Amino acid sequence: MRHARGYRRLNRTHEHRKALFSNMAGSLIEHEQIKTTLPKAKELRPIIEKMITLAKRGDLHARRQAASKLKEDKDVAKLFDVLGPRYKDRQGGYVRILKAGFRYGDMAPMAIIEFVDRDVSAKGAADKARLAEIEAVEDEE
């Protein structure tokens, strides 16, 4: 029987799962949309929902709690400066999961997880900025 089985193990140790979801949460906060397997997306949703709730609180203790779950300071900054105010009036349901077919190779069910009122320009913004910087350096030479 599967009574009181609260989460998916995803064939990983506790430390590996913790690192996986920390990395995935950071990627979702940075890009506002990521593609992953359906079970990972379903497990990531409550983690992100709790992060947004912390960001809506906005105090120092909430910031430290979020920083303990995320690996990079820029993700914490975006969470509290951009995403928290964006979802101030929304009572939950900050992310959506869209099914995206099956992965070639192992037929794993794929999903796209994204923020509900996401900024479309956020996905790939870092890459575009980096390429523009490289192009500017090449033009100077």
From Swiss-Prot:
Keywords recorded for this protein, A-Z: Ribonucleoprotein, Ribosomal protein
Gene Ontology, cellular component aspect: cytosolic large ribosomal subunit
InterPro entries the record matches: Ribosomal_bL17, Ribosomal_bL17_CS, Ribosomal_bL17_sf
The keyword Ribosomal protein belongs to this UniProt entry's keyword annotation: yes
One BP term from GO: translation
One Pfam family hit: Ribosomal_L17
Molecular function in Gene Ontology: structural constituent of ribosome
Similarity remark: Belongs to the bacterial ribosomal protein bL17 family.
UniProt subunit comment: Part of the 50S ribosomal subunit. Contacts protein L32.
Name listed for the protein in its UniProt record: Large ribosomal subunit protein bL17
Organism of this sequence: Ruegeria sp. (strain TM1040) (Silicibacter sp.)
